[in-house]
């Protein structure tokens, strides 16, 4: 059995008995029912995922950041050149990027992995290699990768999770680095939903109107050339996806198989979540949406996943920065259900 098939076979629904027990506990606490909103949803969802009536704080918090390049940047869809990808990797490894700062604040570890940066393999202390190939091919003229490479990218993400996250309970957040990666993400969303490319394509790194129109045309051309099958996640990933998108989909599937909650970041991790959901619909039960990105397609992604974002921060950086902000929110939800007094304990009359 392949690693992907084995992982998919292990994914189960969260424990509904534990969910119901957690909901009863939340309703008995000294507050009007439901008054802590999404914080309560997080608490009972965690109970089901951890398969305990009272969810526990994570013993390990890890932000897994995957880096990969995209052949479609040859079409001029990004404001930044491709060499920024390896330059930013070195910034991550030196602790100077946005994700490093926010993960430090949250007490989380950052793991940076090269899954498909263009050019020769990068040799840098602290960089994990799970390379599938040297960047994807240009999906405007043909498939981004082969179906076998798509499977390898997903399995690389599963393996990375297994190697880097050992403690339980754990909390994992995903992030990425890859110049041009909003282009395949928009293509993936269009492939799965059939929505007009114009409505779901944004400015990415901040391109002007002229380049935005060009980006839309490139995505349309890629969808026409490749004709990805919306009912086959591997087909969509291989034809118009990215290696880091496949890797993040693998991390999500691995978390679902291991009973680990996984925090999504923005638009690119949302594309990975759609691929994961296509391969294993139950995997969405393990996903938490950290924030709503300003990329126009992100709201559509979250609707398709059935997830509500915790935050609206007008962010569009990627790297896992929005996901890192969710760490203390999730831990707060755990503390609320465990530490807040019930009406009976506090001697407070119920409404």
From Swiss-Prot:
Coiled coil: none annotated. GO terms for molecular function: nicotinate-nucleotide-dimethylbenzimidazole phosphoribosyltransferase activity. Its EC number is 2.4.2.21. Pathway: Nucleoside biosynthesis; alpha-ribazole biosynthesis; alpha-ribazole from 5,6-dimethylbenzimidazole: step 1/2. The keyword Glycosyltransferase applies. Keywords: Cobalamin biosynthesis, Glycosyltransferase, Transferase. It holds the Pfam family DBI_PRT. The keyword Transferase applies. It is an enzyme of class 2 (transferase). The active site is at 319 (proton acceptor). One of its GO terms (biological process) is cobalamin biosynthetic process. CDD domains: DMB-PRT_CobT. It catalyses: 5,6-dimethylbenzimidazole + nicotinate beta-D-ribonucleotide = alpha-ribazole 5'-phosphate + nicotinate + H(+). HAMAP family: CobT. Belongs to the CobT family. Catalyzes the synthesis of alpha-ribazole-5'-phosphate from nicotinate mononucleotide (NAMN) and 5,6-dimethylbenzimidazole (DMB). NCBIfam families: cobT_DBIPRT, PRK00105.1. This is Nicotinate-nucleotide--dimethylbenzimidazole phosphoribosyltransferase.
């Amino acid at each position: 059995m392949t690693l992907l098939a084995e992982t998919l076979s292990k994914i189960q629904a969260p424990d509904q008995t534990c969910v119901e027990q957690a909901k009863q506990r939340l309703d008995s606490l000294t507050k009007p029912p439901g008054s802590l909103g999404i914080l309560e949803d997080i608490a009972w969802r965690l109970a089901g995922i951890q398969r305990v009536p009272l969810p526990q704080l994570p013993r390990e918090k890890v932000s897994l950041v995957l880096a990969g390049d995209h052949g479609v940047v040859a079409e001029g869809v990004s404001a930044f050149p491709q060499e920024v990808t390896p330059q930013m990797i070195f910034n991550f490894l030196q602790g100077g990027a946005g994700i490093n700062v926010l993960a430090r604040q949250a007490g989380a570890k950052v793991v940076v992995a090269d899954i498909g940066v263009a050019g020769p393999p990068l040799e840098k202390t602290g960089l994990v290699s799970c390379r599938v190939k040297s960047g994807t091919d240009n999906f405007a003229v043909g498939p981004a990768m082969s179906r076998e490479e798509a499977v390898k990218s997903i399995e690389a993400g599963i393996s990375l999770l297994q190697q880097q996250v050992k403690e339980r309970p754990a909390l994992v957040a995903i992030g990425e680095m890859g110049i041009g990666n909003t282009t395949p993400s928009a293509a993936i969303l269009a492939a799965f939903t059939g929505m007009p490319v114009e409505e779901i394509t944004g400015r990415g790194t901040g391109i002007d109107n002229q380049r935005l129109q060009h980006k839309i045309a490139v995505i349309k051309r890629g969808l026409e050339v490749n004709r990805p099958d919306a009912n086959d996640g591997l087909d969509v990933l291989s034809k118009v996806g990215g290696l880091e998108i496949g890797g993040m989909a693998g991390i999500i599937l691995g978390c679902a198989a291991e009973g680990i909650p996984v925090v999504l970041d923005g638009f690119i991790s949302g594309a990975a979540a759609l691929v994961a959901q296509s391969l294993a619909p139950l995997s969405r039960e393990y996903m938490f949406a950290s924030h709503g990105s300003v990329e126009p397609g992100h709201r559509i992604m979250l609707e398709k996943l059935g997830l509500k974002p915790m935050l609206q921060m007008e962010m569009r950086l990627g790297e896992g920065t929005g996901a890192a902000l969710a760490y203390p929110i999730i831990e707060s939800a755990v503390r609320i259900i465990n530490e807040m007094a019930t009406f009976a304990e506090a001697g407070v009359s119920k409404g």
